[in-house]
Amino acid sequence: YVSKKFNLGKNPIDFVFHGGSGSSLSEIREAIGYGVVKMNIDTDLQFAFTEGVRDYIVENIDFLKTQIGNPNGLSEPNKKFYDPRKWLRIAEESFNQRLIKAFEDLNNINTLN
């Protein structure tokens, strides 16, 4: 409408895709075609971070029940498993992978060269 009314080119208005989390790739690409230049994905990023923590806990549950004692032995320490630096790093990596996917979905890889 705006393009026709004011005799402008394609996509003369930059749009923000509010609530973009959970959108399919085809929906994202369609939105870009309409002039979307920014997409909000905070919910997806929060979930990705939590997903990393969840998966780590599920995978290492027998090492997170006590400080000492696990499937490897009753006197084996578990510190390296419950150390927050370990599971927070896993969460950060999951978060990072979700960011990379968003950049790919939005055709925003190496665009500032």
Residue ranges and their predicted role:
Residues 1-12:
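Alpha-helix-loop-beta-strand connector modules within alpha/beta enzyme cores
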Residues 13-19, 37-41:
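Hydrophobic faces of well-ordered beta-strands that scaffold small-molecule active sites
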Residues 19-23, 43-46:
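Glycine-rich beta-alpha junction loops
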Residues 20-34:
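Catalytic cores of alpha/beta
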Residues 24-28, 48-57:
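Active-site-adjacent beta->alpha loops and helix N-cap segments on the catalytic face
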Residues 30, 34, 52, 97, ...:
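Alpha-helical scaffold segments in soluble metabolic enzymes
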Residues 34-52:
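Glycine-rich phosphate-binding active-site loops on the catalytic face of alpha/beta enzymes
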Residues 58-113:
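Extended, intrinsically disordered, low-complexity segments
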